[in-house]
Amino acid sequence: MPDTLTALPQIEERELADAAALDAMLRGADRPFVLRGLVKDWPLVQAGLQSASAARAYIQQHAVERPFVVSVAAPDSDGRMFYDEAMQMNFRTTKGTLPTIFAKMEEGESQDEAPAIYLASIDMHDFFNGLHEANHVPLGARDPLASIWIGTKTRIAAHNDFPDNLACCAVGRRRFTLFPPDQFRNLYLGPIDNTPAGRAISMVDFQNPDFGAHPRFRDALAHAQVAELESGDALFIPSMWWHHVEGLEKFNVLVNYWWRDTPRYLGQPQDALNHAIMAIRDLPEADRAIWRDLFDYYVFEADERVTAHIPEKARSVLDRLTPESAGRLRAFLLRTLSR
């Protein structure tokens, strides 16, 4: 990694007294922080400290017998799961049994030129029996999605996620480079409808940044922070923070938790943005200005002016959403979008 990235400020490190303190620390948190040794006592972490083979054996003994989706990139990708020159994925996605996938990983550990192999965002409840129960972080009343990420040396381009994220390095080492949400203009984002994993990614090669092609990336770096996680360490990544992730060892395992403190019945903002691109962006400027005002009135600046003149029982989705009104709005959207 170039000196411009290794010299970045370190993400704040915090100390934790107990699980209750973690619950309080996460509540309303909007800045990233590292918790060293948070999961050091996990059986998975202890197995990984013995060897990569021991970690694989431990994971495999909990695996359900079903196909796993795996991504494989050629050795010359240098572990970067990205686009090729034609803007197609530079990796192939296939399915295989976990023993077969792990055998390929182990085979590559003795090779100078090995493919990058990556099992991304595997649901721990659906694909394993007892793995989550033996290796998890209590998160209070939250009901997170718990996923496991298993791979060789990999580089995952900077992207963001809507949920809050607690990322726990279980095996190997990982380097995270983080940027605040407002740095999207300086990260040179790629397509939103042709992505490696569903989120727009930075087109900048962090290992060899081309400042001629991406001059604003220097501005992004002025706001960046970095953390290198050892086995047992954890990192909190707030909602919408951009993160570039590197698996640094020949075998790496991450367990992460995604959650939102807002109700689950609320929709996905990315869906609204995508539809606005289709419906509003290419309108004449005068039309866009009208819709900008309407969005401000109904969404970004919504207050009592929107509903004060409407009888309370007739306000429907213009009032604060409930599970029932959100369901009606979702059904209405499905009908209109299917026309």
Model-derived features: positions:
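N-terminal accessory scaffold of Fe(II)-dependent oxygenases
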Residues: 1-234, 244-339
